[in-house]
């Protein structure tokens, strides 16, 4: 009636939105009404069979759930037949609800058709009443992957695991037998995308250290330090608490857009170890009255599906589990759009699309320097919140270029093993458009993703150059630098393990090589005037030392390393057309492999 009165008075109403329903509206509804909500959503869901499936490694999934069964084509599996496949704990079914529907509440309250482009699978790897020995976690995970491939050999798999070990004692980023198993699974044979939760900050840690210090002090949990895994932390969106007697005096710890109080970080790690988490998704919030905390509050959590289908269809999920399920949904949707895309590329695009919220920058990003604020942002929030639209779509003024390549990092010559290849990518660059923009600031975002093979036998795992099989790096041609000069500079970077770049080289990179050149995915933004960038449409991908080169007795020095390179050029003016000139050049040869000379 108030809105109608405003309209009658001639007040312009820009937009009318239905108020957000609290989670309790669905959770507390009679079960028959919940079935009606589910039936309505089911009738509006259009399923496209793309062959993409997310395999959930968890406590099992209730495949009889009305909103799961149509999209779970294979039987549930388990690594231990004595456990059965039933989800007694509920966590796996909670995960499945988000993996399938992402924002379930939004789909329930609208009447808009819902497009679903992937299915789910379940391999039970955890039975709370029958714990597995920690030394077997890696073997159990490998067994689960084998089962999924046996049950569904033709599927395009994404693996989702929101199970970590808070008791491992590993809190410094070093590899473990479990994280190395994930790296091995990802890199061997048919490459695999593994999405892992960062691990959670517990209530007692928040009580002791406060927020956000508890997040800064809590290390990423094993096995989320795995180099090849896409590790997911959490940020907070919801801040509305429904008033009632139990919540009187409580308010959310985090503001909307800030790091979630649940999210662990790599803030305390030495700089040699990977950036973890790489991205953050919505993991809910924690409520506080100044003395007491409430975690898992319904209104500060994400609506999902319940295992107890006879009592209720809906439930809530929170923390890095919820975030990991969301990232799995985004990755599956991306793979469904580009079915031939390699797992390394899907990971690259998720990271490439991520952006920090303003609240994250205000929370951790000052002073705004490479050594402090930007480093802190990376080590707490990763590269930010992934955006599916940015990942999959190109606009006139923001064009994504994707290159999937493979190079041989090393070769044996005589008694020594040396660097062999680098790749120089001459991009389909819109020089003429950039020249007309003159001093307009333009951004070039570059992401390089590849999967390393972990060093066998745990030998040298404390050394970042001895754990990975090989590392790759990227660099951009500077303005006024010839191709020959650029090649010579990259050759020197390849030849000398201790070579330090001059400080002037890094000035235009937002993060800089010291921050980004760790792990097996590297992303950065180069910002410069358009006239300068017009001369910089050449990128190099080159190798650095790894155990394939150092451990010659294993005879891996002739191995090849696939990689994915994503480059985006973007102008602030939406009316600038970069897309057309790039497309006219796209048929030209993009990659020129260059073999280094004998003295390298």
Region roles according to the model:
Residues 42-75, 82-136, 189-191, 225-229, ...:
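Subtilisin-like serine protease catalytic core
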Residues 126-228, 236-239, 311-318, 322-324:
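Substrate-binding/access-modulating region of protease and related hydrolase catalytic domains
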Residues 343-344, 352, 356, 381, ...:
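Hard-cation-handling environments
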Residues 441-600:
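Long mid-to-C-terminal assembly/interaction modules of large eukaryotic proteins
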Residues 59-80, 235-252, 259-324:
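Catalytic-core environment of secreted peptidases
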Residues 323-337:
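Short, small-residue alpha-helix embedded
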Residues 371-468, 472:
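Secreted peptidase-domain scaffold signal
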Residues 1-43:
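Autoinhibitory propeptides
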């Amino acid at each position: 009636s108030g809105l109608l009165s405003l309209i009658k008075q001639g007040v312009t109403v820009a937009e009318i939105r239905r108020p957000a329903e609290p989670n309790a509206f669905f959770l507390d509804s009679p079960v028959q009404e919940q079935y009606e909500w589910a039936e309505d959503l089911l009738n509006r869901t259009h399923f496209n069979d793309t062959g993409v499936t997310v395999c959930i490694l968890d406590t099992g999934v209730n495949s009889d759930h009305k909103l799961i069964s149509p999209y779970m084509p294979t039987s549930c599996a388990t690594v231990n037949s004595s456990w059965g496949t039933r989800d007694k704990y509920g966590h796996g079914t909670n995960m499945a609800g988000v993996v399938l529907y992402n924002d379930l509440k939004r789909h329930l309250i609208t009447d808009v058709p819902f497009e679903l482009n992937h299915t789910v699978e379940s391999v039970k790897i955890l039975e709370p009443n029958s714990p597995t020995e920690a030394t077997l976690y890696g073997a159990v995970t490998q067994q689960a992957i084998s089962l999924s491939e046996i049950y569904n050999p033709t599927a395009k798999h994404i693996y989702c695991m929101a199970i970590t070990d808070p008791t491992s004692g590993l809190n410094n980023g070093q590899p473990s037998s479990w994280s190395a198993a994930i790296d091995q699974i990802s890199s061997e044979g048919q490459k695999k995308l593994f999405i892992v939760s960062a691990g959670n900050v517990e209530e007692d840690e928040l009580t002791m250290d406060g927020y956000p210090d508890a997040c800064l002090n809590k290390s990423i949990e094993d096995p989320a330090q795995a180099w090849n895994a896409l590790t997911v932390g959490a940020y907070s969106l919801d801040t509305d608490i429904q008033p009632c007697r139990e919540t009187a005096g409580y308010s959310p710890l985090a503001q909307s857009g800030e790091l979630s109080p649940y999210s662990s970080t790599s803030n305390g790690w030495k700089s040699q170890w990977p950036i973890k988490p790489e991205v953050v998704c919505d993991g809910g919030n924690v409520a506080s009255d100044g003395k007491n905390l409430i975690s898992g509050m319904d209104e500060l959590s994400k609506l999902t599906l319940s295992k107890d289908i006879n009592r209720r269809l809906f439930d809530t999920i929170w923390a890095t589990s919820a975030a990991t399920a969301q990232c799995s949904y985004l990755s599956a949707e991306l793979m469904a759009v580009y079915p031939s895309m390699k797992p390394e590329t899907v990971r690259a695009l998720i990271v490439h699309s991520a952006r920090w919220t303003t609240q994250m920058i205000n929370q951790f990003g000052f002073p705004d320097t490479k050594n402090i604020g930007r480093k802190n942002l990376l080590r707490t929030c990763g590269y930010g919140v992934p955006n599916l639209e940015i990942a999959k779509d190109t606009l006139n003024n923001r064009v994504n270029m994707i290159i999937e390549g493979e190079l041989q990092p090393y070769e044996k010559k005589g008694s020594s093993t040396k660097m062999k290849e680098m790749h120089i990518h001459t991009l389909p660059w819109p020089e003429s458009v950039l020249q007309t923009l003159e001093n307009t600031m333009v951004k070039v975002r570059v992401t390089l993703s590849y999967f390393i093979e972990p060093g066998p036998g745990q030998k040298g795992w404390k050394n970042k150059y001895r754990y990975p099989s090989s590392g790759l790096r990227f660099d951009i041609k500077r303005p006024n630098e010839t191709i020959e000069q650029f090649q010579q500079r990259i050759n020197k970077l390849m030849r000398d393990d201790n070579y330090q770049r001059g400080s002037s080289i890094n000035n235009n990179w937002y993060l800089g090589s010291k921050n980004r050149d760790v792990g097996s995915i590297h992303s950065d933004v180069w910002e410069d005037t358009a006239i300068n960038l017009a001369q910089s449409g050449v990128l190099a991908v080159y190798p650095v030392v790894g155990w394939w080169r150092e451990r010659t007795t294993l005879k891996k020095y002739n191995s090849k390393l696939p990689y994915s390179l994503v480059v985006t050029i973007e102008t602030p003016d939406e009316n600038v057309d970069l897309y057309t000139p790039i497309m006219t050049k796209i048929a030209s040869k993009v990659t020129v492999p260059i073999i280094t000379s004998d003295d390298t």
